[in-house]
Amino acid sequence: MARVTVEDAVEQIGNRFDMILVAARRARQIAVQGKDPMVEEMNDKPTVIALREIELGLVNAHTLDADERQSVREREAAEIAAVAAIAEGRSL
């Protein structure tokens, strides 16, 4: 079992409340959305992985926001391409 102290993660984020929000968002990305961990998993749960990523400075609120914006852009581009393909199929 990995021993994670949150003091290092709190120092990276600034305060414990924001750290909790960032850790929860990142853990959800790993567990539910299938995002790849940026550190070795070592059979840890997503929450522990998220805390380790925060401790190492790999994840913060800004990186999560940027990743989310990129995901939205990619999803919108895929939707536009699908609509364009449907429209081309109907116009023939």
UniProtKB/Swiss-Prot annotation:
One Gene Ontology term, aspect cellular component: DNA-directed RNA polymerase complex
Family annotation (Gene3D superfamilies): 3.90.940.10
InterPro entries with a match to the protein in the record: DNA-dir_RNA_pol_omega, Pol_omega/Rpo6/RPB6, RPB6/omega-like_sf
Catalytic reactions of this protein: RNA(n) + a ribonucleoside 5'-triphosphate = RNA(n+1) + diphosphate
Top EC class of this enzyme: transferase
Example GO biological process: DNA-templated transcription
The keyword Magnesium is annotated on this UniProt entry: no
SS bond partners: none
EC number: 2.7.7.6
Annotated GO MF terms: DNA binding; DNA-directed RNA polymerase activity
Pfam families: RNA_pol_Rpb6
Keywords for this protein: DNA-directed RNA polymerase, Nucleotidyltransferase, Transcription, Transferase
SUPFAM superfamilies assigned: RPB6/omega subunit-like
Keyword Nucleotidyltransferase (UniProt): yes
NCBIfam families hit by this protein: rpoZ (TIGR00690)
Protein family (similarity comment): Belongs to the RNA polymerase subunit omega family.
Subunit description: The RNAP catalytic core consists of 2 alpha, 1 beta, 1 beta' and 1 omega subunit. When a sigma factor is associated with the core the holoenzyme is formed, which can initiate transcription.
Biological function: Promotes RNA polymerase assembly. Latches the N- and C-terminal regions of the beta' subunit thereby facilitating its interaction with the beta and alpha subunits.
Protein's UniProt name: DNA-directed RNA polymerase subunit omega
Species per Swiss-Prot/TrEMBL record: Shewanella sp. (strain ANA-3)
